[in-house]
Amino acid sequence: MATPSPTPVPTPTWEQRMNDYVADRFKGRKVVGGAVVIARDGEVLYGRAYGHKNASKNDLVTLDTCFRIASVTKLVSVVGLMQLIEERGIDLDTPVRDIVGFKVINPSFPEQPITIRQVLSHTSSLLQTNHYFQNWETMTVWGPYFSKKDAPGTDYVYSNMNGGLIGAMIEALSGQSVNTYMQENVFGPLGINAAYHPTVLKDKSDIASQLNKKGGNVMTASRIMRESFDDTCNPIEHTDRTSGALYISANGMIRIIAMLEQGGTLDGVRILQPETIQLMMQDQRTIPGSSVQAESKYGLCIAKVEGLPGGTWYGHQGQMEGLSSNIYFQPDTGLSIAVIANGYEAHSEDGVVTIARTFMEKAQEFRTR
């Protein structure tokens, strides 16, 4: 009797190999839960969720799991602010105090106004701090929040305070809470489940816990859902929402960054004008009459990442506790990427966490798919 031939081992498909690659990278970094989504020319070509939503590892992450995405909040939020600036024809060199109706002044340079352009390029002379205050008027009389040696527009310092002012300006201009404005004008039109607190998400069924660098709980999703949230228009007291409080999924993040890559339109829905996005990518020193003289890593809440295959990427990164988040687009290739990693210790190379850089390099394989 003839010996039966061994059953051939199936050759892994390209998607299986990609899934294995993504899982290996997350596992190698000891990530508890994360996701990566890649699009080209506005169309999602690949998405993969990995791991778990919480420290107890009893719920799997999906591409629709909403994470608190830290400073990527700033780029998402500035989309709403730039809409209002477009609609009203506001000059970016307008003093912020003229928009919000309260003082935004460096006490060491009281005669030099802090402008919208300076805030969005992180050249406002506000310093970095993770300590938030009761209201903006309190902040303006406290010198420690401002540089004592560099006037507004003359030096780059990344500051969460700048991000917080985005929300104050949105609320002052729209007369709505930043959450309501963004729901009606950005998230809703793009079909995105996102909110500045999970209790006001449209779909509250898929939320990740906040984890530390060792994968333990900072705040469980169930505890977060017991918090109250003031969803009113109060620009003077809402100080930190647009600096890092947004909850959104990888599927939602890719729609934001793909919209920017596509010149402000996605699936037939226009959010911003193409010239606005070009301005957001630009070195603000080069604008005639600009209130920014300092070299900055940011245009208008958009950073450049150079030195990777395929050309320059544009976008933003977030880091908080054990989470990193990244959204970038690459104009030369039409690629966009969203990466979330939670419950691990992030390491960076040239200002971008290594796990995101790895996936940005791997994304080049999608240029011809």
Predicted feature descriptions by range:
Residues 12-67, 89, 137-147:
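Short, conserved catalytic-motif segment at the N-terminal edge
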Residues 54, 107-314:
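Short, surface-exposed loop or secondary-structure junction motifs
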Residues 12, 284-288, 293, 307, ...:
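Short, gly/Ser/Thr-rich active-site loops of penicillin-recognizing serine hydrolases
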Residues 27-35, 56-118, 150-162, 241-244, ...:
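Short active-site loop at a secondary-structure junction
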Residues 1-13:
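Ser/Thr-rich, Proline-interspersed low-complexity disordered segments
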Residues 49-51, 222-223, 325, 341:
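Short clusters of small/polar residues that mark proteolytic maturation junctions
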Residues 324-343:
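Short, well-ordered beta-strand elements
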Residues 13, 17-21, 71, 76, ...:
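Extracytoplasmic/secreted proteins, especially bacterial periplasmic and envelope-associated proteins
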